[in-house]
Amino acid sequence: MERVKMINVQRLLEAAEFLERRERECEHGYASSFPSMPSPRLQHSKPPRRLSRAQKHSSGSSNTSTANRSTHNELEKNRRAHLRLCLERLKVLIPLGPDCTRHTTLGLLNKAKAHIKKLEEAERKSQHQLENLEREQRFLKWRLEQLQGPQEMERIRMDSIGSTISSDRSDSEREEIEVDVESTEFSHGEVDNISTTSISDIDDHSSLPSIGSDEGYSSASVKLSFTS
C-alpha cells in the first residue's frame, strides 16, 4: 500500500516537472530535447519550482522598478521645471545689479536671503517708528484735553464779564437820556419863568409911567398888549 502511494507521488512529481519544463520552453521560445523519462537529477521538483518563482519575481520586480524609475524621472522633471520657474520669479523680485548678467542658483539664493534680512530690518524700524508716533499722538491728545479745560472756563468767565459790562453800559446810557430829557424840560420851565418875569417886569415898568402922565400910561399899555 505504501509502495503504491510512493508511485503515485513519483508520478505527480514527474508531471509537475514536465509542466515546469514546458513553461520554461515557452518562455525561452525553443523546444526541449530532454527525454521523456526524467533523469535522477530532476526527481526533486522543489528547487526548480523555487527558481521559477524567483525568476517570475525578478521579472515582476524588474517591471516594477522600470515603472518606478519612469515615475521618478517624471517627478524630477516637474521639480526642476518648478524650481526654474521659482528662480525666474525670484530674479524679478530681488534688485539685481546691472553688471550681473548670469546668475547661479547659489548666488541668487544668497542675494535673496540678504534682501529678506534687509526688508525685515526695515519693517522693524517702521514698526518702532509707528509705535513712537502713536505714543506721541496719545500724549498730545491728553495735553490738548488738559489745556482745553481752563481755556473753556476762562472763555465762559470772559463772556459773563462782557455781558455784565454791556448791560451796565446800556443802563448808563439810559440814565443819560433821562437826564437830557429832564434838562430839556427844565429849560422849558426856565423859558416860562423868564417869560413870566419879563412880563412882570414890563408890568412894573409900565406902571411907573402911568403915575406920571396919561400918555405914558397909554404907551405902556400898548407895549404890554404887544408883548402879550
From Swiss-Prot:
Write down the SUPFAM superfamilies for this protein, in alphabetical order. HLH, helix-loop-helix DNA-binding domain
Q: Which UniProt keywords apply?
A: Disease variant, DNA-binding, Nucleus, Proto-oncogene, Repressor, Transcription, Transcription regulation
Gene Ontology, cellular component aspect: chromatin; cytosol; nucleolus; nucleoplasm; nucleus; RNA polymerase II transcription regulator complex
Q: Where is the composition biased (Acidic residues)?
A: 173-183
GO MF annotation list: DNA-binding transcription factor activity, RNA polymerase II-specific; protein dimerization activity; RNA polymerase II cis-regulatory region sequence-specific DNA binding
Biological process annotations from GO = blastocyst formation; negative regulation of transcription by RNA polymerase II; regulation of transcription by RNA polymerase II
Locations of Basic residues compositional bias?
43-56
Bias class Polar residues marks the residues at 57-70, 216-228
PROSITE patterns the record matches = BHLH
Instruction: Tell me which InterPro entries the record gives.
Output: bHLH_dom (IPR011598), HLH_DNA-bd_sf (IPR036638)
Which stretches does the entry tag as region Disordered? 29-76, 161-228
Where it sits in the cell: the answer is: Nucleus
What is the annotated tissue distribution of the protein whose record heads this document? High levels found in the brain, heart and lung while lower levels are seen in the liver, kidney and skeletal muscle.
The bHLH domain extends over 67-119
Explain what the record says happens when changing E152A.
In prostate cancer
How does the record describe its quaternary structure? Interacts with SMC3. Efficient DNA binding requires dimerization with another bHLH protein. Binds DNA as a heterodimer with MAX. Interacts with RNF17.
According to the entry, the disease involved is:
Prostate cancer: A malignancy originating in tissues of the prostate. Most prostate cancers are adenocarcinomas that develop in the acini of the prostatic ducts. Other rare histopathologic types of prostate cancer that occur in approximately 5% of patients include small cell carcinoma, mucinous carcinoma, prostatic ductal carcinoma, transitional cell carcinoma, squamous cell carcinoma, basal cell carcinoma, adenoid cystic carcinoma (basaloid), signet-ring cell carcinoma and neuroendocrine carcinoma.
Record's function text: Transcriptional repressor. MXI1 binds with MAX to form a sequence-specific DNA-binding protein complex which recognizes the core sequence 5'-CAC[GA]TG-3'. MXI1 thus antagonizes MYC transcriptional activity by competing for MAX.
**UniProt name for this protein:** Max-interacting protein 1
Species of origin reads Homo sapiens
Classification lineage: Eukaryota, Metazoa, Chordata, Craniata, Vertebrata
